[in-house]
Amino acid sequence: TDMLAVSVSSTDAIGHKYGT
C-alpha cells in the first residue's frame, strides 16, 4: 500500500510497478 514501504522492501517491485 505504501509506496515508500514497497520501495524499501522490494526495489524490483518498484521498478516494475512504478518504473523508477
From Swiss-Prot:
Catalytic activity, reaction form: a phosphate monoester + H2O = an alcohol + phosphate
Region span, Disordered: 1-20
Domain of life: Bacteria
GO molecular function: alkaline phosphatase activity; protein tyrosine phosphatase activity
Gene Ontology BP term (one): peptidyl-tyrosine dephosphorylation
EC number of this enzyme: 3.1.3.1
Keywords: Disulfide bond, Hydrolase
Description of post-translational modifications: The N-terminus is blocked.
Regulation: Completely inhibited by thiol-reducing agents, such as DTT and 2-mercaptoethanol. Activity was also inhibited by sodium orthovanadate, sodium molybdate, N-ethylmaleimide, EDTA and zinc ion, but was not inhibited by okadaic acid.
Keyword check for Hydrolase: yes
Described function: Acts against tyrosine-phosphatases.
Subunit structure and binding partners: Homodimer; may be disulfide-linked.
Protein name: Alkaline phosphatase
Native organism: Prevotella intermedia
UniProt lineage: Bacteria, Pseudomonadati, Bacteroidota, Bacteroidia, Bacteroidales
